[in-house]
Amino acid sequence: MAAPVLRVSTPRWERIARVLVCLLGILLSLYAFHVEREHARDPSYKALCDVSSSISCSKVFGSRWGRGFGLLGSIFGNDSALNQPNSVYGIVFYAFQLLLGMTVSAMAALILMTTSIMSVVGSLYLGYILYFVLKDLCVICVTTYALNFILFVLNYKRLVYLNEAWKQKLQAKQD
């Protein structure tokens, strides 16, 4: 016997928060991509996020860790198609979170949660590199780390909410 189809929806505040967080993430990632491209084209380029020598996003984006998380170039080679600027991965991640967040399937909720966990782990890794290795503060980077954590919380709340809603709907169908 097939599993019953249970129609539920997520709270409106969650959908609005997801759209805002994902759009902000996409915009910041596009700006990071722009800064990296301009800095590569003109090394004297000064981005809006370059406040001082220790608060500089273009210094971070231009570093080894600004592409492929500092790992993919070592594994696949610097010319590999996978060794893209981190901002490209950010654009894909936030677009994916936005689009998949429009569905309420159990599989989508699990994928959203799994990718959020991966983004938080990646943020912790890059935050460590930022602070302890590069000894820099990148406002764009830190903001995206915060957005990743907010998405993690949203996805966790979504999973809990949908689980509870499905339980209630299933209970009502059985009664």
From Swiss-Prot:
Query: Where would you find the membrane-spanning parts of this chain?
Result: 13-35, 87-101, 107-134, 138-159
Q: Which amino acid positions bind (S)-warfarin, per UniProt?
A: 86, 145
The role this protein plays is: Involved in vitamin K metabolism. Can reduce inactive vitamin K 2,3-epoxide to active vitamin K, and may contribute to vitamin K-mediated protection against oxidative stress. Plays a role in vitamin K-dependent gamma-carboxylation of Glu residues in target proteins.
Query: Topology: which residues are Cytoplasmic?
Result: 1-12, 102-106, 160-175
Could you tell me what this protein is called? Vitamin K epoxide reductase complex subunit 1-like protein 1
**How does its record describe regulation of its activity?**
Inhibited by warfarin (coumadin). Warfarin locks VKORC1 in both redox states into the closed conformation.
What keywords are assigned to this protein? Disulfide bond, Endoplasmic reticulum, Membrane, Oxidoreductase, Quinone, Redox-active center, Transmembrane, Transmembrane helix
What's its catalytic activity?
Answer: phylloquinone + [protein]-disulfide + H2O = 2,3-epoxyphylloquinone + [protein]-dithiol; phylloquinol + [protein]-disulfide = phylloquinone + [protein]-dithiol
* CDD domains per UniProt: VKOR_euk
The record's annotation in InterPro entries points to: VKOR, VKOR_sf, VKORC1/VKORC1L1
Indicate yes or no for the key word Transmembrane.
yes
Q: Which organism is it from?
A: Takifugu rubripes
List residues in topological domain: Lumenal. 36-86, 135-137
Q: Which SMART domains match?
A: VKc (SM00756)
Q: Could you tell me which cysteines form disulfide bridges?
A: 49-57, 138-141
Question: What information about domains appears in the record's comments?
Answer: Partially oxidized VKORC1 forms a cysteine adduct with substrates, vitamin K 2,3-epoxide, inducing a closed conformation, juxtaposing all cysteines (S-S or SH) for unimpeded electron transfer. VKOR becomes fully oxidized with an open conformation that releases reaction products, vitamin K quinone, or hydroquinone. Cys-138 and Cys-141 constitute the catalytic redox-active center. Cys-49 and Cys-57 are the cysteine pair that mediates transfer of reducing equivalents during catalysis.
Q: Where in the cell is it found?
A: Endoplasmic reticulum membrane
Alphabetical GO CC annotations of the entry are: endoplasmic reticulum membrane
Q: How does it sit in the membrane?
A: Multi-pass membrane protein
Name the EC number(s): 1.17.4.4
Give a yes or no for keyword Transmembrane helix in this entry: yes
In this chain, phylloquinone is annotated as bound at 141, 145
